[in-house]
Structures are given as C-alpha cells and as structure tokens.
Amino acid sequence: MSTLKITGMTCDSCAVHVKDALEKVPGVQSADVSYAKGSAKLAIEVGTSPDALTAAVAGLGYRATLADAPSVSTPGGLLDKMRDLLGRNDKTGSSGALHIAVIGSGGAAMAAALKAVEQGARVTLIERGTIGGTCVNVGCVPSKIMIRAAHIAHLRRESPFDGGIAATTPTIQRTALLAQQQARVDELRHAKYEGILEGNPAITVLHGSARFKDNRNLIVQLNDGGERVVAFDRCLIATGASPAVPPIPGLKDTPYWTSTEALVSETIPKRLAVIGSSVVALELAQAFARLGAKVTILARSTLFFREDPAIGEAVTAAFRMEGIEVREHTQASQVAYINGVRDGEFVLTTAHGELRADKLLVATGRAPNTRKLALDATGVTLTPQGAIVIDPGMRTSVEHIYAAGDCTDQPQFVYVAAAAGTRAAINMTGGDAALNLTAMPAVVFTDPQVATVGYSEAEAHHDGIKTDSRTLTLDNVPRALANFDTRGFIKLVVEEGSGRLIGVQAVAPEAGELIQTAALAIRNRMTVQELADQLFPYLTMVEGLKLAAQTFNKDVKQLSCCAG
C-alpha cells in the first residue's frame, strides 16, 4: 500500500470524488480515501505514475503529496518508484520532488512555476534580465498607462460636449507622466512577481542567461559571474519575444526607437514617424499624437489587413480625423539620420517621396527569444521564424521539454501565455491539459478599440463554413448615442443553417469590455437567437451584442428602447 496526503477536502463527498478520480488512474487497483484523515491509501501496480496520481487529485481542486516512503524491503513502493523514474538526489534535491527548470519570468513562466509548486514540484526559475518579463515592464502595463494619459489629454482638448464644457489645450508634463507610469510598473512588478517569488521556498531564482548543454541540463551564465549547471526532470521554455527590426538599409545605424525606448522617452517629439501597422505601432502612434506629436504611419499594406476590411477602414478614418497621417501601401527603402546642431533628424526614403521626423518608432512585430538558447543541442523543433513548435498541451518535439508564451507559435497575448503556462505545469506533473484557442478574445487599445473573437467571414469561408452575418452600426446602440460617440460597429458571424454564433468583430469605444460576453457565447455554442433572448442591462455598450443579434430577424430601428 502507498499513501497520499491530501489537503483541501471539506467533506466526505469530497473523499468520494477523489476516490473515483484515483481509481481511474492506470495502475491503481483500489483507493481508500478518508476525509477525516486527509489521506488516500492506494493499492497500485509497479510502474504507476506518481505524477498521474497527484494530477488526478489536483484536477479536483485539491493538493496531493506523497507520504513518507515505505520500507526498503517493500517492492514497488511509490516513492522508490518515483526516485527511480526521476533520478537520484544530485538531480532533484534531497526532497525527491520533481525538478522543473523554467527559463523566463513573464506571464507564462510565473503561471507555470506557481502551478508546478502547487502540484508538488520543485522549481528553478532562470531570468537574464528584469523579473516580470515584457508585459509588466515594457509592454501591456506601461503602454496602457500611457494610452490612458493620452486619452485624458485628448478629452481635455476635444470632446463631444465642447458646446457646454470649454475645451482647453492641456499642458503635457511628460517627465511627471513617466514617473507616475514607472512607479506603477515597479509596484506591480514587486507585488505580482518579485514578492511572490521571494515568498515561495519551493522556487529558486537564478539571475543569468540559460542555454542548453543537452536535453537534460542547462548551463546558466550568472549575471554576477560564473556558471552553474542546472539538471532538470522537466523544462519549460518561456523566454518571450523581442521587437523585430526589418532589414531596411541604413536603419541599424540610426538611433531608432522600438516600443521599449518609446515607452520610457522623457520627451514627446514634435514629429514622429512610425514604421509598421502592428498592434503596438497603432496604439503608440495614437498615444503620441494625443500627447502632442505630429505622427505619420507607414503601413506596408492597410491597417488591420488580416482582419475584416471594415475594421481597418474604421480605424484609419478615426486616425485621420485626429490628424494622424496614415500612408497605406508605403514602405521605407532607406533610412538615414542627420546630426544637427541640437537634435538630429531622420530621413526616410519611400516610393512616394521623403519623410522627415525627429524620432522614428519601428514596430513591425515581435520575434521569439530562442536564438541564444542552443536549442540545437536538444532536438526541439522551431518554425522558420524561430518560434518553438508546440502541441495544445505545450509539449515540444522533445518529450520532457515544454514551451509557452511568445517564444512559441501561439498568439502573442499575455493571457494566452499565462493559460499556456498553467497547462504546461499540469502536464509536466503528470496531468493532461490542453489550451483551446477557438474562442480567444483579442483587443487593440486604440480609440475606438478593436475587439475580435472567433471567425471572421473570410476565415470561416476558408474553412468551408457557410455564414450569415449582420453588422450593427453604433448609431443604433443607446449607450453610444448617450455618449455622443457613434464611431464604429458590431458584426456577428453566424453559421448558416444552425444559427450558431461563431465570430464577433467590434470597433467601438471600450469594445474590449464587451468581447468577453461574445467569447462566452461562442464557447457555449449559443445560437444568435439565444443571444438575442438574453437580458442585457440598458445603456451599456455590451447591449449592442443583443441588438446586433436581433437584427437577424428584426429591424432594430423600429424597436423601442430596451425592447426585449
């Protein structure tokens, strides 16, 4: 008999559920689970996976750990088998716990490390730079703070209520805004990353650069000097991505910005040129424009060219209304930088003439941070772009090496990374979890915002799905009318015949606040009629989803306010 200690059970019914789960694990002959004792006595076959046992319990929301090892004379003892599987103490430490190496400290890495510890593993987390990764330090958090500040500046300068509230030209104190922004970044980094790691004795943090020696060992070049070899039972690669820089002649010899430098700039340039039409490019372009810069965007195609064409058209129109110059189908063939008496000047050569600017932001996408990992020593498969190829369980081509987040071929969103990290940890500790991205919401924080989930019409047709779609302009949404801001639309894509909702695209102020409702509707396979029949609070933007659903069989212009 082997014993598991179980915490988290609250009644005898919990014990029944745990018993059922354990007896479904291959190799378990019987399980006697006691809520009062907080334990499970197991009759198991030799070779039964201890990871599978703890994962089965964890899947119910409880925590299981192995009790003391049985006597040496007992053949097939669970802890003995575990040590045989995982190696001796020189590899896993005196605790005998599964040892997981995590490379990185961003959203995927943190989620994985914490979940792995919860599952009973011991973690070594390796970070070459600042703890926290891209999102909190140089991505989501500082950019959204800057975007919000720019939005406030814009409203003071211009709003739909200028007839009754006098507009004014705001004074922008960029250094003060930057100090406020970075203080919040520091606060969140400590509260959500550094402090959590420091307080968890099962996680060891190494500050240095990791590379693979082989598929069982890492070499860590420590930041304070020296090297350390880290042997592991499982490894998670969560190294994120960095700004990609296009091979434009002359560009590398200039002091161009990526988003990293732009977010911590102490000044707002008079003239800003932006190469790229990525999400980052568009969000920062509008923010800088609202803070006082004259902004010109060079887009290789159109804005949002991969999305429904109406999205790009709506955002382009909004940008041009604010004085942002959008040059579509325009690329820089040469970039030069001319040093002046005080400040230099960028000169961009295009097929349509020269563009001169005080600063240049290059935001053409992000490339996975995999080049310096020596992955050729492991056999891990990469895409031609250097992204790690993974399956829905975050497994790479090497059985015990996993990957999650922006360094993989998954969508580059921090919430996707965190969800992937959690599932990777479950799988590394013997579980079987997959990440389903069929109803993944995405938001672009321009104004109006862009929010999407599920299929666009073109994507559905590409996959052989016949569709029926409706588009509701915001002049039919009471909240937008009350705001005196009817820019944008909500579009629903429905599977023809079944009436099932399969996609939503929205361009609207605060569109991000409505898209999760759409995601839940898609995930739960709701029909458009079922969505139309739901109760939505009046004078909210999300009510637009109901109204858009009603357009499939009604003329909403003929409905009274909040008509059900």
Curated annotation (Swiss-Prot):
Its cofactor is FAD. Residues 1-65 form the HMA domain. Its EC number is 1.16.1.1. Keywords: Disulfide bond, FAD, Flavoprotein, Mercuric resistance, Mercury, Metal-binding, NADP, Oxidoreductase, Plasmid, Redox-active center, Transposable element. Binds 1 FAD per subunit. Homodimer. The active site is a redox-active disulfide bond. This is Mercuric reductase. It comes from Shigella flexneri.
